[in-house]
């Protein structure tokens, strides 16, 4: 009668424990004592249950049985061997097998046991079968990753490698006119593309081109504004089609190539854009790494360097708030809470501000900028969003803070961040000089000292996940983790995968309700949908779409109900509208364009209405006496109340 595979497994365990015992030097023992221990273990293991992936406890169980097996096989007692071989080890096999899901269990074959006998001799005596399986699969997957992914990133783009491309590098600081020159050349294209970091910049190019009589389409993750017979596509860099050929391309803000989260899109654009003429606009710090990428492709390049068109001066005296406020000032802080706090204080002093921060919808940011451009507001309060190519008539940049939270910790601004923001002062054509200052002598000294330090060149290039790995026979999260663990050669560094793994984990809990969860191409589309994972209402809507996208030709409309209040409620709803559009496009669903445009318009109007109202409620006050706190106070309590509490 042919043995079942379970019997084969039991025999494998017995053989491994017996072989391990032969290598050990036995010592005289009281056999009766060990018979008692064997019976006790046989009884306890019969009812043992372990949660999935409880590997430490399972390994410990294997080690306990190893000690019992040493005595059993050394003593060669028939009764002891019966208890071990017929009662304990079969139950150990059961416990081990309960750790495997149905798909994983397919790998447990006689060939796999042969491999364990050869490469993992005796390992089952100290480690669970799942631990050995995980180690083996990891090794196999790493080998497969090395096989599938070219050793050199440029080889992932064979079409671009086969072309003769010429790069023109426009290198200069902010307000130097580098992007203007590249766009002037783009106007001559019959089939051109602009690739920028922000929807607002794509919109600016879209409007300038169409105003100049050059048909231009805008394409971003949030929307598509299609113009018939367009010669130019203005888009965010993530939207690049690496299979489409252009005659001229412009890649803007290429110093972003080092960004942990989005930098891989610039790397992909430089290595993979199919255009005979490619203009790259960047800060001087990115010059060497961008040239390195071009050299990898054996393409030609020329360098055009630009000087700042207006002088930039650091003021001698620190800024005092609100006494020193002047029209044309831009106040820099690093959170939405701080932006609204400063805006409220300015309004208290009769000064109308525009506000710019990351969670504002792009169209609202644009309207706030327009108010400032048209002098309907006197100043602007912004996060570092102001530093990324936004053209505003700013006379002076005022750093109210010189520290920011970067997602991990609160840290001082680095020189590249200071220069990027400070460079927005003194718009060419409006001012001869741009000014920079900071609140308080300590902050001003920090700016002064930091600006004297030579800016470090970028020495990192971000690499994205290669989708060729989606062909591998393994869970998607395991593939992503193993790919990320493998260190690339300098100057490459792999993108941060924390957010997509978070979304994978969120979806995995509901995998039985997600159609085609095992389709890695489909699942990867879902988990790389760009959403704010800090907004849990948004994450829940994303999960609902994952579970229901096959139900109809269109997705359900976003839920207006929210636990949030005021501005946050409408900002979150706007993000839900963006998710409705993005998920629909990714999954081939029909978008109700008229409804979406109407909802966006209504939501934008509501946000603008709320921003036009008094921001007194956002001013940070002492939680005890209600007194307005000094800017930068981190305790939410005034000095007098703090002193009273400390008495």
What are these regions (language model features)?
Residues 176, 180-183, 188-211, 286:
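Conserved Walker A/P-loop ATP-binding site and its immediately adjacent core
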Residues 224-226, 354-355, 360-383:
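Conserved helicase ATPase core of P-loop NTP-dependent helicases/translocases
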Residues 191-202, 279-281, 324-349, 353-357, ...:
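Conserved strand-helix element at the start of the C-terminal RecA-like helicase core
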Residues 1-147, 466-647:
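Non-catalytic terminal extensions of ATP-dependent helicases
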Residues 256-307:
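Post-DEXD/H (motif II) to motif III coupling segment of the RecA-like Helicase ATP-binding lobe
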Residues 168, 284-287, 293-295, 299-345, ...:
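Conserved interdomain linker/interface between the two RecA-like ATPase lobes of SF2 helicase motors
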Residues 285-286, 392, 396-399, 403-406, ...:
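Conserved segment of the helicase C-terminal RecA-like domain
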Residues 209-245:
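Inter-Walker segment of RecA-like/P-loop motor cores
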């Amino acid at each position: 009668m042919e043995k079942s595979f379970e019997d084969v497994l039991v025999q494998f365990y017995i053989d491994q424990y017996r072989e391990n015992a032969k290598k050990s030097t036995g010592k005289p023992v009281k056999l009766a004592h060990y018979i008692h221990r064997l019976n006790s273990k046989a009884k306890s293991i019969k009812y043992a249950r372990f949660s999935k992936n409880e590997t430490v406890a399972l390994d410990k169980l294997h080690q306990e049985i190893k000690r019992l097996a040493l005595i059993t096989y050394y003593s060669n007692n028939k009764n002891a061997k019966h208890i071990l071989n017929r009662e304990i080890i079969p139950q150990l096999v059961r416990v081990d097998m309960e750790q495997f899901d149905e798909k994983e269990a397919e790998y447990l074959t006689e060939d796999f046991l042969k491999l364990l006998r050869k490469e993992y001799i005796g390992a089952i005596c100290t480690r669970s079968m799942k631990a050995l399986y995980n180690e083996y699969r990891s090794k196999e997957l790493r080998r497969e990753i090395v096989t599938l992914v070219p050793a050199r990133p440029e080889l992932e783009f064979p079409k671009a490698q086969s072309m003769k491309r010429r790069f023109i590098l426009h290198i200069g600081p902010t307000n130097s006119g580098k992007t203007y020159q590249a766009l002037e050349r783009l106007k001559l294209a019959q089939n051109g593309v602009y690739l920028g970091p922000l929807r607002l910049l794509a919109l600016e190019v879209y409007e300038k081109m169409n105003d100049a009589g050059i048909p231009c389409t805008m394409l971003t993750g949030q929307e598509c504004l299609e113009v018939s017979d367009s010669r130019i596509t203005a888009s965010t860099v993530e939207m690049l089609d690496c299979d489409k050929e252009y005659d001229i391309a412009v890649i803007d803000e290429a110093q972003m190539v080092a960004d942990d989260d989005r930098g891989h899109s610039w790397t992909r654009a430089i290595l993979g854009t199919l255009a005979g003429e490619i203009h790259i606009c960047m800060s001087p710090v990115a010059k060497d790494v961008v040239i390195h990428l071009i050299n990898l492709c054996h393409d030609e390049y020329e360098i055009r360097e630009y000087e700042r068109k207006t002088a930039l001066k650091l003021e001698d005296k620190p800024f005092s708030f609100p006494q020193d406020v002047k029209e044309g000032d831009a106040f820099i802080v690093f959170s939405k809470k701080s932006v609204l706090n400063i805006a409220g204080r300015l309004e208290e002093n009769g000064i109308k501000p525009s506000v710019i921060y990351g969670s504002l919808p792009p169209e609202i940011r644009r309207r706030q900028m327009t108010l400032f451009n048209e002098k309907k507001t006197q100043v602007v309060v912004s996060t570092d969003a102001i530093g990324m190519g936004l053209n505003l008539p700013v006379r002076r940049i005022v750093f109210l803070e010189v520290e920011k939270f970067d997602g991990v910790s609160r840290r001082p601004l680095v020189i590249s961040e200071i220069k990027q923001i400070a460079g927005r002062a003194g718009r060419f054509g409006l001012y001869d000089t741009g000014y920079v200052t900071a609140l308080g002598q300590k902050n001003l000294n920090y700016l002064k000292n930091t600006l004297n330090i030579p800016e470090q060149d970028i020495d990192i290039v971000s690499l994205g996940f290669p989708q060729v790995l989606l062909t591998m026979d393994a869970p998607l999260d395991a593939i992503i983790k193993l790919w990320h663990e493998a260190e690339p050669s300098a100057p490459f560094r792999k993108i941060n995968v924390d957010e997509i793994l978070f979304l994978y984990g969120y979806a995995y809990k509901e995998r039985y309700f997600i159609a085609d969860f095992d389709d890695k191409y489909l699942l990867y589309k879902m988990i790389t949908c760009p959403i704010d994972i800090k907004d849990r209402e948004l994450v829940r809507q994303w999960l609902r779409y994952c579970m229901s996208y096959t139900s109809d030709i269109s997705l359900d409309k976003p839920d207006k109900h929210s636990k949030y209040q005021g501005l946050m409620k409408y900002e979150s709803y706007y993000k839900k509208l963006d998710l409705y559009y993005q998920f629909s496009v990714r999954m081939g669903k029909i978008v109700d364009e008229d409804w979406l445009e109407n909802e966006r318009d209504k939501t934008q109007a509501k946000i603008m209405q709320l921003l036009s109202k008094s921001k007194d409620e956002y001013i940070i006050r002492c939680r005890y006496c209600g007194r307005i706190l000094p800017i930068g106070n981190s305790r939410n309590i005034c000095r007098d109340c703090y002193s009273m509490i400390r008495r």
